């Protein structure tokens, strides 16, 4: 039910990911989160304790926040947190991703004032740059495959 609300709130954006592990649900924005951190802080702990899972005892990370209601979930997701919930508990864990190639100053627009970020070859990094500046649930992206030979992923 929470995931359906989030999917509706984020307007079916393609980087909103959902996984279910042993009655525990995991939701995160792929463009803002590190898959390595998700594996280390969340997935390893959930898959090791298959019989009896208590979220409060099994999730570790640099910043874990226990939530009481639905209101602040989108704020946390847009700031690089993953949502972990089951029937009893709901919490977020910081799994903010690191940028792959450094974001450089654009060479073609050297006289423009303001932030000096530029896009690179990674779709996820570019989405992350946009979503870190524009923290809104109605910012939606959709993935496509273009080209007959190269089949490039565009968003």
What is the role of each PLM region?
Residues 1-155:
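Membrane-embedded alpha-helical signal segments
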